[in-house]
Amino acid sequence: MSATSLPGSQQPDLGEIRHDWSVAEIRAIHDLPLMDLVFRAAQVHRRHNDPADIQRASLLSIKTGGCPEDCAYCPQSAHHKGAGVARERLMPVETVLAEAAAAKAAGAQRFCMGAAWRQPKDGPEFDAVLAMVRGVRGLGMEACVTLGMLTPSQAGRLAEAGLTSYNHNLDTGPDFYEDIISTRTYDERLQTLANVREAGIGVCCGGIVGMGEGVTDRAAMLQVLANHAPHPESVPINALVAVPGTPLEDQPAVDPFDLVRMCATARIVMPRSRVRLSAGRKSLTREAQVLCFLAGANSIFYGERLLTTANNGQDDDAALLADLGIRVGEPVRAAAE
C-alpha cells in the first residue's frame, strides 16, 4: 500500500521539519509510485512555499579551468586535459559586475560566481572576490560563490562582504564518493559547510544524478543534507552532463523521471529549502520541467551557460514560466527554517 492510500491516522507527516532521517526512510519515499510521490511532494511544497514563486539564478565562471581536483565529472579539472577547457585567469571585478548587471536586467535575482580552485588563497584574488560580492549585493541581488574549501577566517570575510550563500556540493552519498573524487575527502566538504554555517552564510549544497551511483547513494546524500540543522538554504539537483574527455564521458543520459524523483524527495525531506533544478535541465522537455516544478523545484539557473556547459535559452525559460503563470521569485530566506 502506498503512502497516499494509508488511512488518515497512519499517514506520515511528510511536511514536518526533521533532522533525524534514516537512509531507509528516504529511500522508501523516493521509491513511491511516481504519481504518489509527486502528489505528496506537491502537498509539502504548497504547505511551506508559494508554488507560483520560482527563483531565477544566473551563474558565471569567474576563473575557469586548471583545477587541481580530479572530480570525474568536471571538464575544468587539470587531470582531464582531453576535455579541452582552457585555463583562464580570474576575471576583473568590473567585468563580473557588468555581467551581474546584465543578468539582473534579464530577470535574475541571484548571481552565482564559480572559481575553479581547490581552495582560495588569501591575497589579491580573494580580495577581488570580496569586491565582486559587495558589488553584486550593491546591485540589489543575492550573491553566491563557489570557490572550493574555505577556512573559518575566509568564511567570516565573505560574510562581512555580504555573501548570501556559499555553494559547496557533496556531489553524491558518502559510500560512492571515492569512486568520483580522490583529491578531497567527504569530511573536508562537510568541514567547509560547517565553516560557512558558523559564519552565518546560507548553505547551498546538493549533488549530481547519473554518475553511476545507485538509488541508495542518492538517498544517502539527501540524508546528509536533511540531517543538517538548519537545512540548506538551497539544494541544487544536477543531472550529469557527460563531457567528452572526462572519465564519465560514456555515462548514459539521465532518465527525466529520476530528476523528478530527486526533486520530489528533496522537497519532502527539506520542506523549505530552495530546490534548484540545475545542470542537465537543457536535456529536459518542457513537460518534464513542469513535473519537476510540480514536485517542488522552485529555482532554476537562468542564462545560456552554466560555467562551461550549455543551459536553456533565456527566451525559452521566460516563455515556459509565463505559460505556467509563474512569477519571478522573491529573495530567499537567509536560512531554510
From Swiss-Prot:
One of its GO terms (molecular function) is 2 iron, 2 sulfur cluster binding. It catalyses: (4R,5S)-dethiobiotin + (sulfur carrier)-SH + 2 reduced [2Fe-2S]-[ferredoxin] + 2 S-adenosyl-L-methionine = (sulfur carrier)-H + biotin + 2 5'-deoxyadenosine + 2 L-methionine + 2 oxidized [2Fe-2S]-[ferredoxin]. Pfam families: BATS, Radical_SAM. Disulfide bonds: none annotated. Its EC number is 2.8.1.6. Residues 52-281 form the Radical SAM core domain. [2Fe-2S] cluster binds at residues 112, 144, 204, 276. Pathway: Cofactor biosynthesis; biotin biosynthesis; biotin from 7,8-diaminononanoate: step 2/2. Keywords: 2Fe-2S, 4Fe-4S, Biotin biosynthesis, Iron, Iron-sulfur, Metal-binding, S-adenosyl-L-methionine, Transferase. GO terms for biological process: biotin biosynthetic process. It is an enzyme of class 2 (transferase). Its cofactor is [4Fe-4S] cluster; [2Fe-2S] cluster. Binds 1 [4Fe-4S] cluster. The cluster is coordinated with 3 cysteines and an exchangeable S-adenosyl-L-methionine. Binds 1 [2Fe-2S] cluster. The cluster is coordinated with 3 cysteines and 1 arginine. [4Fe-4S] cluster binds at residues 67, 71, 74. CDD domains: Radical_SAM. Catalyzes the conversion of dethiobiotin (DTB) to biotin by the insertion of a sulfur atom into dethiobiotin via a radical-based mechanism. Belongs to the radical SAM superfamily. Biotin synthase family. HAMAP family: BioB (MF_01694). Homodimer. This is Biotin synthase. It comes from Methylobacterium radiotolerans (strain ATCC 27329 / DSM 1819 / JCM 2831 / NBRC 15690 / NCIMB 10815 / 0-1).
